[in-house]
A protein has these predicted regions:
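A short SAM/SAH-binding and catalytic strip from SAM-dependent methyltransferases
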Residues: 48-60
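Alpha-helix C-terminal capping/helix-to-coil transition sites in glycosyltransferase folds
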Residues: 44-45, 71
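Class I SAM-dependent methyltransferase SAM/SAH-binding core
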Residues: 1-37
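S-adenosyl-L-methionine-dependent methyltransferase catalytic module, highlighting the catalytic core
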Residues: 62-67, 74-167
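Structural signature of beta-strand start/N-cap positions in the alpha/beta core
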Residues: 8, 45-47
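Short, conserved loop/helix-junction motifs that constitute active-site signature segments
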Residues: 1, 68-71
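Short conserved loop adjoining the S-adenosyl-L-methionine
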Residues: 37-43
């Protein structure tokens, strides 16, 4: 994006090692916690803000969403879907917390503290009063639209939810 579209990209990363990797690749990134450090950015600092598969790891996801939509005009949020059929079956039949490609950790070392499904995130948007502009589900490496008529199936088979959101 930076090279081909002349996009100004900046990031916040909590892991010191990942910050160093980003800097080595020529990316502008600061070490910090989005839950706390987004406050330092002025309102509407960015056109788009991206939060990739970390919402479930924050203590207060509602604060993070509010801050994303304060500093960015729009936000792209991706979540691992805990409503996926494989996750449900592991818990039901094995009686253990599932390990999948989008949920690769054991229960005791996972950063995930909030289990969220695609349907939960849609409901969350109503509760938090933000608008979902576009929603997609990743199913077997294919991306498809989520709608009211197919949300049951996307919630059941989707491995990842991808949402473009903005303030109402």
């Amino acid at each position: 994006l930076r090279k081909n579209k002349n996009v100004n990209i900046r990031g916040i990363e909590i892991s010191k090692e990942k910050v160093q990797i980003c800097i080595a690749k020529g990316l502008t990134v600061i070490e910090g916690n989005a839950e706390l450090d987004l406050k330092q950015f002025p309102k509407n600092s960015f056109d788009y803000v991206v939060l990739g598969q970390t919402l479930q790891a924050f203590i207060n996801p509602e604060i993070v969403i509010k801050e994303l939509l304060r500093v960015g005009k729009k936000a792209i949020v991706t979540i691992p879907n805990f409503g996926n059929w494989k996750v449900r079956l592991d818990l039901l039949f094995k009686g253990t917390m599932p390990i999948t490609s989008s949920l690769p950790h054991e229960w005791y070392n996972t950063p995930n503290i909030h289990m969220c499904t695609i349907k939960d995130f849609v409901k969350f948007s109503d509760t938090m009063n933000f608008k979902i502009v576009k929603s997609l589900a990743l199913i077997n490496k294919n991306i498809s639209n989520i709608s009211k008529s197919n949300i049951f199936l996307k919630n059941l088979f989707g491995e990842l939810g991808i949402f473009l959101i903005e303030n109402k």
